[in-house]
């Protein structure tokens, strides 16, 4: 019998979340973001599940794009960080990838390269994130340079990223939007602006393309949920089982450092799954875990391969009882808050030794 820990991936839920993102912005095209192995869900399986819905995909780098091409994904694929070396341009050209451009050296390399066909290019505007891209006062000159290079560049788009769209705090977001609107009008530029939170909460940010990412996988990216974000469905359910039960007297401690101590005679369940699988070691005592569909609290520090829960109030639970660490019935965002982290970290942190089991893989 194999270890019971498994990441159960519901591809129908992924499709429904994508359709929700698409329906939030009916006049935009929605790029499905599948970077970081589809946020830990498996990029090939997720892209294949969306191939009849998504007109394009987005990844961080060339290696991720080539993995999709080798798996038979034929839609356009955007490299969100662009290329890291001019030598990558031959593969970008050969595989008909779209590239972001955020630095002068990339522009120089792109215009020095002789492509078989002009390369679709998305020029990154730093509208306030201050991470990648050209400042507003420098953007137009770069745009004009690329727009004139029709033998090298095609489908030139303005692309940016929002720093605070998740907070529903309008002030900084609207400053970013004002910066974008001025350039967009002067350049008559097609745009890709909205990430997941902007797709869900800021219709004015919906452009020619949107980039839903974490919302596709069922995590609510908004600090304050709205009706649309509440409709998202979990795609990954991290499942396990109780593999042992311990009876503790009052005052006995559990786990490394004895952080949790029984305040009464207690039943402790041991779950297969720990930080060596991607469950966050910083989870606090009381972090919710589902056992037999009921919430029980984490009790003690998470170990590499196991964690422990207090089963005292759930006498029917025992060895073999099903466990959900996050997913169906237990939102990953709630677990993340108990770990002082975010859902992105938990999703992408599920390690390779945890098997992925895909449900509803048929497309259509």
From Swiss-Prot:
GO terms for biological process: D-alanine biosynthetic process. Disulfide bonds: none annotated. Pfam families: Ala_racemase_C, Ala_racemase_N. Pathway: Amino-acid biosynthesis; D-alanine biosynthesis; D-alanine from L-alanine: step 1/1. It catalyses: L-alanine = D-alanine. The modification N6-(pyridoxal phosphate)lysine is found at residue 35. Its cofactor is pyridoxal 5'-phosphate. The active site is at 35 (proton acceptor), 256 (proton acceptor). One of its GO terms (cellular component) is cytosol. It comes from the Bacteria. Belongs to the alanine racemase family. Catalyzes the interconversion of L-alanine and D-alanine. May also act on other amino acids. This is Alanine racemase. It comes from Chromohalobacter salexigens (strain ATCC BAA-138 / DSM 3043 / CIP 106854 / NCIMB 13768 / 1H11). The lineage of its organism: Bacteria, Pseudomonadati, Pseudomonadota, Gammaproteobacteria, Oceanospirillales. The gene is alr.
């Amino acid at each position: 019998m194999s270890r019971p820990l498994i990441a159960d991936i519901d591809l129908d839920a992924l499709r429904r979340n994508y359709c929700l993102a698409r329906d939030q912005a009916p006049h935009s095209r929605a790029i499905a973001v599948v970077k970081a192995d589809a946020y830990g869900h498996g990029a090939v399986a997720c892209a294949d599940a969306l191939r009849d819905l998504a007109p394009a995909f987005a990844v961080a780098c060339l290696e991720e794009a080539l993995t999709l091409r080798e798996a038979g994904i034929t839609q356009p694929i955007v490299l969100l960080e662009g290329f890291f070396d001019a030598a990558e341009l031959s593969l970008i050209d050969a595989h008909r990838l779209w590239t972001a451009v955020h630095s002068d050296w990339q522009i120089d390399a792109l215009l020095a390269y002789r492509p078989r066909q002009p390369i679709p290019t998305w020029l990154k505007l730093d509208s306030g994130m201050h991470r990648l891209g050209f400042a507003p006062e420098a953007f137009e000159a770069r745009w004009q340079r690329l727009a004139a290079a029709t033998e090298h560049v095609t489908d030139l788009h303005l692309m940016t990223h929002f720093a605070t769209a998740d907070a529903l705090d309008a002030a900084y977001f609207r400053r970013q939007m004002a910066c974008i609107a001025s350039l967009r009008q002067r350049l008559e530029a097609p745009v890709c602006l909205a990430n997941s939170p902007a797709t869900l909460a800021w219709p004015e940010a919906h452009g020619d393309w949107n980039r839903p990412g974490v919302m596709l996988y069922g995590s609510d990216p908004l600090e304050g949920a709205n009706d649309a974000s509440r409709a998202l469905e979990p795609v990954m359910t991290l499942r396990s089982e109780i593999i042992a039960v311990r009876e503790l007297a009052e005052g006995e401690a559990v786990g490394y450092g004895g952080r949790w101590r029984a305040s009464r005679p207690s039943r402790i369940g041991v779950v297969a799954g720990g930080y060596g699988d991607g469950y966050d070691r910083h989870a606090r005592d009381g972090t919710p875990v589902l056992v037999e569909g009921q919430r029980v609290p984490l009790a003690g520090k998470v170990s590499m391969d196991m964690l422990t829960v207090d089963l005292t109030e759930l006498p029917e639970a025992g060895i073999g009882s099903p466990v959900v660490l996050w997913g169906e019935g237990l939102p990953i965002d709630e677990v993340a808050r108990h770990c002082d982290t975010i859902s992105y970290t938990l999703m992408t942190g599920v390690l390779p030794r945890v098997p992925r089991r895909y449900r509803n893989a048929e497309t259509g």
